[in-house]
């Protein structure tokens, strides 16, 4: 569904080019949950912005369904990729229904008027994340976990085959982090969504993810199943320059001792 070919991401400022990650060859398929792991500030958000079309690649190709990302119009992309942001300041003055309805913008035309089918999709999206009882509540009154579910419902209402989330469990308490990850896993399977998320919740994400994209210290990205990345030592070497190592017995990183 989504793949990259020798992708290099970073920034241009006039003639100055800053490379963040390079030669990336990874894929994302329908029905799977993939977690993007790596150290803070290593380029995970830059990669997500690039493969979602928000930021231009420095070189290489991002393809969706075998077609170059640059060949799609912005409207076409809005029907292919839904993006869930972590910013807690967004949409506080809207009700849950109004927020989720924004996901229908690619289909509602210039004036944004929803018809019966649009309202049906919105209702189904809210139900899918277990928020029907909060439909008319203002987003500002929701807990962080409820707000994240509402944002996921907005992406579902957009009816895209791909959903990308940048740190969806940031700011959440333990129970909400677990609920959010379990929800994303269930949506990937039941609705055959291709879901990609970045996260620091290693211990929580590993049991639920289908595959990993690991950003290494040498600015490359390695993909594979947990079993593959444990067997070849990639997970253990992820933070090789730090005093931590991967412990496969607890599926998390521990301080070396």
Question: Where are the predicted features?
Answer:
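Conserved ABC ATPase signature
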Residues: 138-142
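Catalytic Walker B motif of ABC-type/P-loop ATPase nucleotide-binding domains
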Residues: 163-166
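The feature captures the beta-strand-to-loop junction immediately N-terminal to the Walker
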Residues: 37-39
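Conserved ABC ATPase "signature" region
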Residues: 101, 116-134
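ABC ATPase nucleotide-binding domains
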Residues: 239-257
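Helix-to-loop junction immediately C-terminal to a conserved catalytic motif
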Residues: 52
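Conserved ABC transporter NBD signature motif
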Residues: 60-68, 77
